[in-house]
């Protein structure tokens, strides 16, 4: 099971848009996740957003680079940025994404 959380223990049901970039030599990469109207921003949610947690059977990948975008004075979008600083981190992220994509009907397309 592969899930994304913003507060530990609370799964985010909204499936994000994800943009990936990677350095030409493959040594570093970045993933930017964009969640429109996520459950974590719902009025009834009282959980504090402490980061973005990507959790699967291998463990947890964490980033604290999480921002909210506001429209008409209300939070509407959560954008999270995960920086991978080695090929091992990139490979681990891609294994998570393969599991998450399979469970949520996502597909990978190269730009």
Swiss-Prot record:
InterPro entries assigned to the protein according to its UniProt record, in alphabetical order: Psb28_c1_sf, PSII_Psb28_class-1
Recorded superkingdom: Bacteria
Keyword terms, alphabetized: Membrane, Photosynthesis, Photosystem II, Thylakoid
Gene Ontology cellular-component terms listed: photosystem II oxygen evolving complex; plasma membrane-derived thylakoid membrane
Subcellular location: Cellular thylakoid membrane
Subunit organization: Part of the photosystem II complex.
Name used for this protein in its record: Photosystem II reaction center Psb28 protein
Gene from which this protein is expressed: psb28
């Amino acid at each position: 099971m592969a899930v994304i959380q913003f507060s530990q223990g609370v799964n985010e049901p909204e499936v994000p848009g994800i943009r990936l970039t990677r350095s030409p030599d493959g040594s570093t990469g970045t993933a930017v996740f964009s969640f429109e109207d996520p459950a974590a921003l719902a009025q009834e949610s009282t959980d504090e957003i402490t980061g973005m947690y990507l959790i699967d059977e291998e463990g947890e990948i964490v980033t604290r680079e999480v921002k909210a975008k506001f429209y008409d004075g209300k939070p509407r979008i959560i954008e999270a940025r995960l920086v991978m600083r080695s090929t091992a981190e990139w490979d681990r992220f891609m294994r998570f994404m393969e599991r998450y994509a399979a469970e949520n009907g996502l597909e990978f397309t190269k730009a």
